[in-house]
Amino acid sequence: MAIGNLDWTQRGGALTLTERWGLTLAAIRKHVNLRRQARPDGASRLANTLDRLGLRALDQIEHPWDALAFAASTAAQELQPQWLTHHCWRTYAWGTLLAVNADLKYDKSLFFSACMLHDLGLTSHAAAPNDHCFTLRGARAAGDILRSAGASETQAHCVAQAITLHLNLDVGVEQGVEAHLVQAGAGLDVVGQRSQEVPALLRQAVVDKHPRLSFKHQFCSCMQNESRNTPQSRTGLYVRRLGFLDLVRQAPFDE
């Protein structure tokens, strides 16, 4: 059973010893990659589609206006603090730009909905036990919101699984392109993962439109609280053992 998928999270998101070791080794590899990415010679990266498009790439970030997207964005605005909702918008922007670079095809409405609601479990509006992983709490709440807006079970499952998977260190496209992009977008915004793939001009434009509002401080506080409540979860491992909060603070953003 894959870590982070919906079936796996039904046990509350607690890691087995084997899973903890596997994630620890993966985190070490990820940390090495982030350090390499931060080196000055990273500026000499190969040109990509976003370089060629320049600011025109921002046109791709236009969000969908169907019933599911409207329900997700409305819920995000009403149920989340502003700093967290801006993070959700940036997650969507980064994921969209990375998809342009990789020429990935996906369901834009479901991807957008998952981005808007992927951290809903960090708020008090996610109805599930506090000792369960916040991604499970958020996935359940998101499913209810989208079903109320007319989502099919297949659509609700896609969004919910993208939410529970996004806390993994990597999500392959074979696990769902939408899930892959949510994790990629959130990873870029939180720790700077793959930020070198997005030209500085585009990064600044996204942050100007959706300001960070002391994101690092706010997010680290949430993660510390989550790790105390769910010490056996992925968050508990990342925060207590793997230096996750330091990676957040070192991300290539001012706040």
Locate the predicted segments by residue.
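Divalent metal-dependent phosphate-bond-processing catalytic cores, especially two-metal-ion Mg2+/Mn2+ enzymes
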Residues: 1-54, 81-89, 93-104, 151, ...
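Divalent metal-dependent catalytic cores for phosphoryl transfer on phosphate-bearing substrates
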Residues: 110-209
